[in-house]
């Protein structure tokens, strides 16, 4: 039998077509073979400004312009490459040294290959995103070269060649092509310009060897960096991950069990034997974590290092429930990593066990507790981490643990290993190798985690940069912003280009014929005013009320028309959607929109005409809404009040002008609305908020700036109408966009969230909390009153708030309609509409509402504006929810820091006068642990842990230094009753009643608040110390 | 056309006169040295062109074209599927591990044949696909003899088992590109064979009873019919001893056994047999999988009338000219040169001869397999 095979070699087109074949496993378990055809081309430019060939062949856009070339014609040289050089990094170089590539001191003119970019995406999505943003910026001159599409640089995979080898070969092929190409172009140009060297950077030793054979210049990352100036600093920024693996060779003692393979995890997850969730470390005990999984309605506990198995707070982990005999109750003890692992040495790996003696002791005591008989301490299911889905590692702000640097710290440039203590207590210490240990002590630094190997007790990371001295304003503010992932860089030029060209001179067009008036109602004759906190510059909202001829009233809420200035999908819109919200710190505001818009053009400033988006209601004198109307408008605010001034004006009977009358009407309506809302079951929640008015003079006591928020009638006036506007808009938007409306919901908290609080209240006060509905909760909260303790009610409200879930933005299609409910406000539907200057969600809702009412925009064809696909909207929701939460945390942390600094300033002043006695205040016990309590100080809105040594026992001098007090801890014992929530602290061997201190939950205690410097290992850190004095 | 559609057999008879049929029959039945219309030897196949891996999106594919212009393309696709345990196995509890879960199930191989002019539920495609599928899933290698490859224990069915809960499902799509000029079975079978040879399955990364998880690199995908080691390939031995089965069409005319019959040859055959063979041991011995008889079209041809019985010819010929002679193959009395439709039935010795020709060392079966092996897969 003869058979002949068709011959393809004669086909001239064959070499232009290549294909990429791979296997794709889908979520549903399907396995597909995917074939992508590649049509190779020759018009992809090298993008070097030196090149004389490429400009003529590069593809042009519709206007005949070609993309500007990126790589400099005079690239920087180094000692080794005096004629200048272009860099071609391999994937492993980027994995190990992304921070270096982002560094502004070096690494310019880099050619990023498509091959490398794709490989990077498969290995690390965050790094991929960072690289993309690097490519987008112009300064660093990173060029993305589509080498796989270019005929000359496309590399076909050889038989039995691994993907890795093939990609390495592709990198080398590009380097030699560039060399040849630039050489040819220089020859053709006959210019005596010297051709820069093409340097491949790879950490693959095999590839370097092959490069040598192929006459391609290749260096390892560290070799290359060593040849640069300032190499010591730069060398610190290379990731430890690869190096550690290489150098160690035989792996030492393995402390942690290995993670399961992906397929094992998937099998387990599908079968329901394993569970997946986010690893969440307890703020009070770093050895205890919880993971909330969908299968159970209570989070699972994870106790101890063994069980956490290298998970770090924020990681997506796979866990396995432990057998019942290992179930434990959550700890009743405050455990600080710093305290327990004080004496660890970062260099010695050999002697350390994964669970140190001290830690084991701490755990043992918990187990004992768990076996106690009490009801609350009933053992809870525990679990252990068996696999890792996704690391949630980010960059961490911290400081070098001075105790870990060793004696010769200052002496030399020798590389040594130090511990970095992250600011976030939930993150373990990070082992960092550095050559600059001496310089870094006392600095706020940014580090990142690279790896956590099985044979290492702590994760290993590397140094990125220093933010400045500890406790300096600049460093601490930046630290805060970094820690909460707030985008604080100035707006790039592309964003500022989107602003109106008139700048501050922009005005509402005079002629009504102007296109700016299209679809706008003229409301300039209405008596509109705004009421805001004092000194507010970004005025989002203004109000009016007037009597109608039929005896009803017209009430209007006018919101800054930000969507007029921020057009969908331009650079400014994208930037705002990334920032998500404006972040308010004590002395700084990180704007979502550029200054010009936020504080001027959009801001509804008094006496000038502004574009607005108005919601108008006709209401009866009993505040029944007859109809509501939405329109884009032009308004002129008559006055901008602060809450106090508005209140004064309303209360002043001599003021009888129309504006004041209108405000009185508004106030009247707001009270009715408020009552209606409470009748419907809205909650009056409390959060420990204080306000800092930082503009008072330097001479006075800085603590006077710290004010608890006063609630005036005018506050709730504005609040009520904003709620009403939001609710009205929400239902309108939902009517028009049943799938894509952007709404806000507050899920009903599961009753078990309240179990602890209910238990505590009934034990300590005999009070009951009915959590069956928000209305029931509201009324039972109202009943939680202690006549002797006026703050008690607020305290309960704070604790109740913490039991609830947080409200979130969502897109209407994501939930069924009954799930839209806002629990706290007792409203069936809700959204955010009233603060578009500072929240991106409001801006989106503005666009949706504009489209819902058929507003056509200036040019008449902007009917559907903004996001109209659900997938994209859900992405945005995820982001703004995250940003919103972080902004709140950052704000609180900022206040906390400010209070600490104010206390410190006061302390220093007092110290000059002789004594540093702190300040005496009232505090309330929020939580009782076995070895301490958590106390809330309403005056400063702070809560702090009071440890054993910080109890001032009767007959003892209160003011002792920190180190003196620390000595006390060992001499003290406690009697802790977890059922009664009481703690008795006394001197060892002195159990007489009068020598000890008893504290119990909800108790009002006298405390002494001061800011103290930590000594010893934590030197340079400052904390607010609370002493219980009685 | 309608009667052609209904045909389940090789009955697409060319329109030949009884005289032509008789001439063909006579030359083909010449003892020991039949003369075929195209001059081939009895065991000679028509030349063909073959290539594999022509469809990049499939797991394996092949195209074969015969010189007469008939062409077929076969694509093989594989899909992961959960093994459903039958209720009675579940009821029987732990001990009764489903045989299907461990040794595979015939229904995991699906075959569809498309022939121009036929609906997919017409008799011919259904019959053909069932005939080919049967030998595919029926080819079971005895694991115990030690010669069989571990991976192919249990044959193709066994190869499709991933673990107790998961298996591969194989879709074999056969497309005949031209009108069926001759009975398409050999063409389709050869093409399917070639396609299966080139079929690869993604490499399994998970182990044991885990949910399957595969390597995303296609280069490391493994052949459905595993290759032997390189050493064997270079030493000239068959590089691969477990092969998908091949179904050969064999006809007998008189005492003669003729392979790869053309349409005209089938039209006069005494018997048409589809013989499936495979090789599953290292020694290289072929194994007979099945023999199926196919309704010979010669049954339906018009008979010729001997002169002696022809009224028109009465007295025109000498009565001695058409004396009935005993046909040694069929044992019937026939007048030489006068066509009589075959009535079926074939002698035991002829069938034995057929099988021997296929299976013997250096026989037709081996020749075919070697020829197909010559088509470079990859």
Residue locations for each model-derived region?
Chain B
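Polyanion-binding surfaces on beta-sheet-dominated domains and ring/shell assemblies
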Residues: 1-378
């Amino acid at each position: 039998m003869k058979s002949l095979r068709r011959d393809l070699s004669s086909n001239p087109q064959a070499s232009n077509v290549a294909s990429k074949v791979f296997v794709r496993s889908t979520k549903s378990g399907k396995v597909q073979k995917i074939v992508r055809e590649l049509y190779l081309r020759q018009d992809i430019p090298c993008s070097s400004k030196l090149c004389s060939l490429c400009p003529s062949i590069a593809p042009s856009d519709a206007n005949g312009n070609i993309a500007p070339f990126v790589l400099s014609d005079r690239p920087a040289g180094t000692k080794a490459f005096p004629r200048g050089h272009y860099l071609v990094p391999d994937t492993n170089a980027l994995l190990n040294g992304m921070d270096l590539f982002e560094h502004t001191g070096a690494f310019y003119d880099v050619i990023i290959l498509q091959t490398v970019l794709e490989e990077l995406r498969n290995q690390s999505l965050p790094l991929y995103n960072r690289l993309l943003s690097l490519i987008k910026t112009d300064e660093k001159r990173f060029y993305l070269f589509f080498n796989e599409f270019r005929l000359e640089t496309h590399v076909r995979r050889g038989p039995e060649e691994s993907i890795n080898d093939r990609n390495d070969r592709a990198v080398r092929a590009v380097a030699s092509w560039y060399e040849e190409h630039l050489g040819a172009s220089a020859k053709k140009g006959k210019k005596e310009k010297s051709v820069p060297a093409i340097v491949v950077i790879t950490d693959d030793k095999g590839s370097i060897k092959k490069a040598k054979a192929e006459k391609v210049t290749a260096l390892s990352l560290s070799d290359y960096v060593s040849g640069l100036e300032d190499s010591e600093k730069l060398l610190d920024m290379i990731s430890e991950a690869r190096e550690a693996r290489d150098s160690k060779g035989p792996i030492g003692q393995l402390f942690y069990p290995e993670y399961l393979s992906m397929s094992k995890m998937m099998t387990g997850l599908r079968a329901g034997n394993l569970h997946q969730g986010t690893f969440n470390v307890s703020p009070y005990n770093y050895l205890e974590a919880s993971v909330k999984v969908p299968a159970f309605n209570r989070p699972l506990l994870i106790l101890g290092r063994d069980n956490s198995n290298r998970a770090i707070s924020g990681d997506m982990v796979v866990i396995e429930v432990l057998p019942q005999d290992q179930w434990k109750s959550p700890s009743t003890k405050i455990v600080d990593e710093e305290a327990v692992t004080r004496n660890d040495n970062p260099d010695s790996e050999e002697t350390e066990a994964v669970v140190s003696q001290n830690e084991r002791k701490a755990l043992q005591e918990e187990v004992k507790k768990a076996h106690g008989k009490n009801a609350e301490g009933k053992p809870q299911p525990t679990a252990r981490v068996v696999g890792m889905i996704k690391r949630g590692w980010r960059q961490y702000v911290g400081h070098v643990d001075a105790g870990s640097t060793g004696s010769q710290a200052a002496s030399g440039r020798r590389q040594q290993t130090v511990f970095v203590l992250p600011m976030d207590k939930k993150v373990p210490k990070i082992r960092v190798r550095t050559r600059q240990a001496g310089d870094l002590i006392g600095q706020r630094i940014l580090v990142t985690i690279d790896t956590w190997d099985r044979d290492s007790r702590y994760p290993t990371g590397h140094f990125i940069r220093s933010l400045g001295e500890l406790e300096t304003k600049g460093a601490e503010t930046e630290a805060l912003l970094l820690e909460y992932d707030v985008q604080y860089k100035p707006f790039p030029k592309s964003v500022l280009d989107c602003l109106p060209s008139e700048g501050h001179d922009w005005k509402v067009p005079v002629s009504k014929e102007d296109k700016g008036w299209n679809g706008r109602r003229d409301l300039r004759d209405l008596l509109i005013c705004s009421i805001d906190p004092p000194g507010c510059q970004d005025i989002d909202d203004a109000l009016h009320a007037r009597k109608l001829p039929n005896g009803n009233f017209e009430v209007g809420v006018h919101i800054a028309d930000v969507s007029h200035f921020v057009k969908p999908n331009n650079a400014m819109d994208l930037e705002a959607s990334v920032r998500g919200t404006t972040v308010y710190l004590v002395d700084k505001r990180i704007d979502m929109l550029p200054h010009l818009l936020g504080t001027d053009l959009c801001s509804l400033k008094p006496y000038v005409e502004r574009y607005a988006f108005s919601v108008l209601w006709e209401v009866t004198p009993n505040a029944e809404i007859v109809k509501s109307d939405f329109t884009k408008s032009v308004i002129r605010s008559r006055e901008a009040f602060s809450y106090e001034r508005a209140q004064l004006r309303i209360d002043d009977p001599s003021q009888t002008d129309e504006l004041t009358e209108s405000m009185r009407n508004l106030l009247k309506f707001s009270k009715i609305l408020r009552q209606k809302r409470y009748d419907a079951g809205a909650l009056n929640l409390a959060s420990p908020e204080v306000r800092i008015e930082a503009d008072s003079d330097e001479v006075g006591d800085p603590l006077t700036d710290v004010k608890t928020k006063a609630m005036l009638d005018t506050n709730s006036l504005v609040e009520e109408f904003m709620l009403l506007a939001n609710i009205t808009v929400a239902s309108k938007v939902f009517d028009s966009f049943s799938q894509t409306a952007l709404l806000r919901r507050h899920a009903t908290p599961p009753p078990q969230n309240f179990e602890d609080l209910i238990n505590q209240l009934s034990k300590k006060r005999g009070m009951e909390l009915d959590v069956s509905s928000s209305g029931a909760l509201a009324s039972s909260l109202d009943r939680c009153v202690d006549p002797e303790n006026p703050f008690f009610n607020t305290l309960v409200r704070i604790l109740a708030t913490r039991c609830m879930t947080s409200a979130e933005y969502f897109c209407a299609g994501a939930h069924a309609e009954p799930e839209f409910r806002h629990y706290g406000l007792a409203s069936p539907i809700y959204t955010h509409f009233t603060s578009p200057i500072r929240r991106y969600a409001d801006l989106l809702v503005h666009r949706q509402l504009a489209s819902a009412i058929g507003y056509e925009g200036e040019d008449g064809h902007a009917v559907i504006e903004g996001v109209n696909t659900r997938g994209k909207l859900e992405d945005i929701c995820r982001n703004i929810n995250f940003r919103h939460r972080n902004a709140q945390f950052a704000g609180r942390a900022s206040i906390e820091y400010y209070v600490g600094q104010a206390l410190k300033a006061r302390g220093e002043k007092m110290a000059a006068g002789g004594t540093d006695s702190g300040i005496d205040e009232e505090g309330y016990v929020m939580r009782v642990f076995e070895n301490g309590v958590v106390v809330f100080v309403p005056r400063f809105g702070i809560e702090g842990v009071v440890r054993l040594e910080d109890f001032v026992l009767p007959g003892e001098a209160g003011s002792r230094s920190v180190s003196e007090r620390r000595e006390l801890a060992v001499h003290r014992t406690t009697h802790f009753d977890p059922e009664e929530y009481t703690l008795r602290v006394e001197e060892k061997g002195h159990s007489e009643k009068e020598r000890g201190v008893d504290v119990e939950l909800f108790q009002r205690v006298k405390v002494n608040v001061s800011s103290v410097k930590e000594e010893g290992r934590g030197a340079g850190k400052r904390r607010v110390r609370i002493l219980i004095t009685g | 056309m309608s009667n052609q559609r209904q045909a389940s057999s090789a009955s697409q008879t060319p329109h030949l006169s009884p005289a032509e049929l008789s001439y063909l029959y006579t030359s083909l039945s010449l003892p020991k040295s039949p003369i075929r219309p195209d001059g081939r030897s009895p065991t000679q196949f028509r030349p063909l062109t073959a290539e594999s891996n022509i469809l990049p999106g499939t797991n394996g594919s092949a195209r074969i074209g015969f010189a007469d212009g008939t062409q077929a393309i076969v694509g093989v696709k594989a899909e992961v599927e959960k093994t459903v345990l039958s209720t009675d196995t579940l009821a029987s509890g732990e001990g009764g591990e489903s045989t299907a879960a461990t040794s595979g199930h015939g229904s995991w191989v699906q075959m569809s044949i498309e022939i121009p002019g036929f609906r997919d539920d017409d008799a011919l495609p259904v019959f053909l696909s069932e005939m080919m599928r049967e030998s595919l899933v029926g080819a079971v290698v005895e694991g115990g003899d030690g010669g069989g490859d571990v991976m192919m224990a249990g044959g193709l069915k066994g190869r499709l088992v991933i673990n107790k809960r998961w298996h591969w499902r194989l879709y074999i799509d056969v497309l005949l590109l031209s009108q069926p000029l001759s009975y398409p079975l050999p063409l389709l079978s050869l093409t399917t064979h070639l396609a299966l040879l080139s079929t690869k399955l993604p490499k399994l990364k998970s182990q044991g009873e885990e949910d399957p998880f595969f390597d995303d690199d296609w280069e490391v995908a493994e052949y459905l019919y595993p290759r032997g080691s390189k050493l064997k390939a270079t030493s000239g031995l068959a590089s691969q001893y477990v092969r998908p089965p091949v179904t050969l069409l064999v006809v007998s005319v008189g005492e003669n056994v003729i392979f790869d019959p053309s349409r005209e040859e089938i039209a006069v055959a005494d018997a048409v047999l589809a013989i499936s063979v495979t090789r599953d041991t290292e020694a290289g011995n072929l194994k007979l999988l099945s023999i199926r008889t196919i309704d010979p079209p010669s049954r339906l041809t018009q008979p010729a009338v001997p002169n002696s019985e022809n009224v028109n010819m009465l007295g025109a010929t000498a009565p001695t000219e058409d004396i009935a002679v005993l046909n040694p193959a069929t044992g019937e009395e026939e007048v030489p040169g006068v066509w009589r439709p075959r009535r079926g039935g074939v002698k035991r010795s002829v069938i034995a001869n057929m099988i021997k020709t296929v299976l013997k060392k250096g026989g037709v079966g081996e020749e075919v397999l070697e020829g197909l092996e010559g088509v470079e897969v990859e």
